[in-house]
Amino acid sequence: MNFLIVGTIRNCQRQIFQTIKCLDKGLYFANKIEYFFVESDSDDKTLDSLKKLSRQKKNFRYESFGRLRTKLPIHTQRLALCRNRCLEELKSKKNSWVDYLIVVDTDGVCRNINSQIIRKCISEKGWSAQTANVKGPYYDIWALRHNTWSPNDCWQATKKE
């Protein structure tokens, strides 16, 4: 099993190390793992952490869009640009080896990944995507806008309840 792990990253200078450690441990059974992260608008030392990881791990790469806030003031627009870059990376010919794409959060929510559960889920037939779950509100759903799936602003909906 070969995994390309991607994600967007901003202001995660410390959390990224724990995230990578967690993923390496949880996917120990993989034949191949490569990491690709897209950074923008960090105010901390995230870029230094990414540089350090890319020197330490041959399978770790990243790109930085620098300051997008001035060009794209809306957070979801910046996220979309960075996520689309991750998808472009997946589609590139150099990644034809990829069996599975894993999109991760890099802000410290990645903990205690159970490799047995991952293997079991992957072995199931008939799926195109699998998603993780967390306790409590999950902010990423806010970025999803679709006329059928999520036509409203989830935070506005929770305020009305």
Q: What would you call each of these model-derived segments?
A:
Residues 25-30, 57, 89-98:
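Alpha-helix termini
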Residues 12-27:
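Short, well-formed alpha-helical segments that are part of the catalytic scaffolds
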Residues 95-109:
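Short beta-strand-to-loop acidic/aromatic patch adjacent to the donor-nucleotide binding site
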Residues 18, 22, 49, 81, ...:
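Alpha-helical elements of Rossmann-like donor-binding domains used by nucleotide-donor carbohydrate transfer enzymes
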Residues 51-85, 92-93:
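Conserved donor nucleotide-binding strand/loop of the catalytic core
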Residues 2-7, 23, 34-37:
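Hydrophobic targeting segments
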